[in-house]
Amino acid sequence: MESTLRRTWAEIDLDALAYNYHALRRRVGADVKFLGVVKADGYGHGAVQVSRALQTLGADYLAVSSLDEAMELRAGGITMPILILGHTPREQVKNLIDLHITQAVSCQAKALEYSQEAVRCGGELTVHIKVDTGMSRLGYLVSGGHFAAGTADICTACGLPGLRAEGIFTHFAVSDEPD
């Protein structure tokens, strides 16, 4: 049942989405992977509908915050790769593997936890390594004198049994601030 208590809403023009996708694709080139972030219901814009459009357009990946968001996309017919940017409890690793969902790993403790659980389940979990480049966000710290230790930890995580490291990323949450 639709709520009539709110007086504001957003209407997403999927033709405009397609135009913007093609503009970005031209800008970065066909050899660069395209990941559409649709977390928090596409920031309130309808994650399933936007994801279907991006899948049809040829995007390579989607990103969400949590396993429940990823499961909603799978239930909505999304078959393309999905990356979970947030934490997933270790007891859900089998679901990640079974649903072909990629998990972000932001520290050695999580890498070890996911590795142990994937091995216990008899599967392989695809992961992307999250790097903190000095903005005090989650991730392996590789700035401010931590480069050698951080990269060593990343290399160790990439070699853990039960994990298949596919990508690496960072998050410029406040990139316009000087520090």
Show where each model-derived region lies.
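Active-site-proximal beta-alpha core segment in soluble small-molecule metabolic enzymes
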Residues: E2-T4, T8-E11, A16-Y19, A30-D179
